[in-house]
Amino acid sequence: MHSPIPELPRFERRLTGPRAAPSSPVSTNGSPLNNLVRSRLSDGALNFTGGRIATPLPQPSLKTPESPLSKRNPTIKQNRVRFDLPDDELSRSNVSSPEKTLLTSASTSTFDSLKKELLPELPSLAYSDDDEFPSSPEELNSHVNYPDVRNVYDCHTGLQPLVDHDCIEDRQKTFASKQLPTLPLQKSSKLSNRRPALHSFHSAPANSLYPLPTPTSQLPSNLSSNNLFQSDSLKPSMVSSHTSTKPVLYRGNSEKSCHSCGGSLRAGRIISASGKKLHPQCFKCDTCSQNLEHVGFYYREGKFYCHLDYHEQFSPRCKHCKTPIEDQAVHINNDWFHENHHFCAGCSEVFNVNIPCIYRDDLYWCQTCYDNKYAVKCKKCRKPILGISVKGSDGEYHSQCWTCGACNALLGDEGYFMIENTPICRPCKAISVKFNLD
């Protein structure tokens, strides 16, 4: 029988630990009397192994670090004692039970066996310090060990994963120029219990390019739409660089190019005029380079003009004032007039629809002015003869002006006599002869 360890007060248990040896009462100043504890430890009377007295162990080192003051009594300084166990005791305390060790070893072996069956070793590169780094893809493939894909099982279904051998072989042939490591696969005829094959463009390498769908109507004559996509072929077709050419911008050729300079219209403001699109700075007169953004303009033969330059170059000119006609015009005998400049050269009366005009000597005349200027004048009244005239020996007369100089009778067709440049009828001539009136 071992003598029980006397129960310590709560205050002393806190000082020395739950399994510490009984100590002497605390002094009045708050520090424990450690001499008794040190003497017992030196004699080997106490050993702490689960609260029982055992064979003496090597003397532990006693450390009494200073602790802060207690919150209950700040004046009393509390010290805690910590015992450092030797290394052999620590090793003995960590030894587990035989049952636990046996269970651990059994579970470890089971996990290792399942790991080897379910997760085969991945291909790895093993080089020593003396080996040299492979300089070619063929030398690299000689150092790589790849597992057989048929030995890998699906952990969820217990079935082997499906591998499309035809697809992989075609892909290897296509990218043979890249010298990629290939998998040593073999064709298998037992596919009854496997999943159906899914042909998808996503199974191809990420750097492969496939042609975009092309409508049948746009295909060349030597190609057909059936040759574009095949469900059992995943061979990528690389787009050649010479197929896409940069478009050449001509002046006014494209809606996205400026009509004047041919530059791009993708950014900034765009002006649309007469079905043409231009930069704001390019929308100017072709003659004087005036900006036409906020003024009137004219479009002719692919060029833009301001108001003045267009009329100066293309509008007809008035025959009277020699200036371009901008508004309504009068066109007669290949001549152009302003509406108010077509008037009589004699009286300046403007011609209209009701007033006829007569053209002579490169001028336009009204009837009155024309008669006054160009008509034959009567020898007697000096007025123009517009109708029937009588032609005398000294000139033409109106029919009513053709009379006898003595009696003013109409001469008619009876004949006459000229006396002193005056026509005299027959009766008047007879009287003059009778009475010697000469």
Swiss-Prot record:
Q: Where are stretches of biased composition, namely Polar residues?
A: 24-37
Q: May I have one GO cellular component term?
A: nucleus
Name the UniProt key words of this record, in alphabetical order.
LIM domain, Metal-binding, Phosphoprotein, Repeat, Zinc
So which domain of life are we looking at?
Eukaryota
Per the record, residues carrying Phosphoserine are 67, 96
Domain named LIM zinc-binding: residues:
256-316, 318-375, 376-435
Q: Kindly indicate whether the keyword Lipid metabolism belongs to this entry.
A: no
Instruction: Report the CDD domains cross-referenced here.
Output: LIM (cd08368)
- Pfam families the UniProt entry points to: LIM
GO biological process terms, semicolon-separated: actomyosin contractile ring assembly; actomyosin contractile ring organization; protein localization to mitotic actomyosin contractile ring
For this chain, the annotated S-S bridges are none
Enumerate the residue ranges of region (Disordered).
1-37, 49-78
GO MF annotation list:
F-bar domain binding; metal ion binding; Rho GDP-dissociation inhibitor activity; transcription coregulator activity
Q: This protein is called what?
A: LIM domain-containing protein C4F6.12
